[in-house]
Amino acid sequence: MVDPNLVTFVLTIVNILVLFYLLKRFLFKPIGEFMENRKNEIKQNLEDAEKERQEAEKLKEQYYEKLRGAKSEAQEIIQQARQREEEIIKEAKQEAKQEADDMIARAREEINQEQKKAIESLRSEVSDLTIQITERVLNDTIDKDQQKKLVQKYLKEVGRVS
């Protein structure tokens, strides 16, 4: 009769071998292929990156050459811009001064017109008040005490109106 431990041992070995075969076939092989593909992809990316770096270096050199050539042109443009700036500032100052003078003249004219209107309005109000006071005085025959009270009352009214 066979020892049960030996059978278990042999079955365990067989199971391990079957598991190893299955892992190798379905896990290790695809992972190995994936790793190889990934390695090739990384290698290709590194080669592409090196080519792009070299091309970028060439472009950088061309850029610096153009930059060196453009410095004198830039200085000339800056000088022209400064001259134009000074001209614009001078023109703006002249325009601002002219506008300010015009605004002051218009403001003075408006003030004069408003002053004339105010004086005319006051004259009209004083005239109306004088007429009202005269009418009341003539309509009311009163003694001196009542007259004083009436004048004070009218003066208070005039004070409120103005």
Curated annotation (Swiss-Prot):
Keyword Transferase found: no
Domain of life: Bacteria
UniProt keyword list: ATP synthesis, Cell membrane, CF(0), Hydrogen ion transport, Ion transport, Membrane, Transmembrane, Transmembrane helix, Transport
Membrane topology: Single-pass membrane protein
GO CC annotations on file: plasma membrane; proton-transporting ATP synthase complex
Principal location class: membrane
Residues that span the membrane, as ranges: 6-28
Subcellular location field: Cell membrane
Coiled-coil ranges (or none): none
Annotated GO MF terms: proton-transporting ATP synthase activity, rotational mechanism; proton-transporting ATPase activity, rotational mechanism
Keyword Transmembrane helix part of the UniProt annotation: yes
HAMAP family noted in UniProt: ATP_synth_b_bprime (MF_01398)
Annotated family: Belongs to the ATPase B chain family.
Function summary: F(1)F(0) ATP synthase produces ATP from ADP in the presence of a proton or sodium gradient. F-type ATPases consist of two structural domains, F(1) containing the extramembraneous catalytic core and F(0) containing the membrane proton channel, linked together by a central stalk and a peripheral stalk. During catalysis, ATP synthesis in the catalytic domain of F(1) is coupled via a rotary mechanism of the central stalk subunits to proton translocation. Component of the F(0) channel, it forms part of the peripheral stalk, linking F(1) to F(0).
Complexes and interactors: F-type ATPases have 2 components, F(1) - the catalytic core - and F(0) - the membrane proton channel. F(1) has five subunits: alpha(3), beta(3), gamma(1), delta(1), epsilon(1). F(0) has three main subunits: a(1), b(2) and c(10-14). The alpha and beta chains form an alternating ring which encloses part of the gamma chain. F(1) is attached to F(0) by a central stalk formed by the gamma and epsilon chains, while a peripheral stalk is formed by the delta and b chains.
Protein name per its UniProtKB record: ATP synthase subunit b
Organism: Natranaerobius thermophilus (strain ATCC BAA-1301 / DSM 18059 / JW/NM-WN-LF)
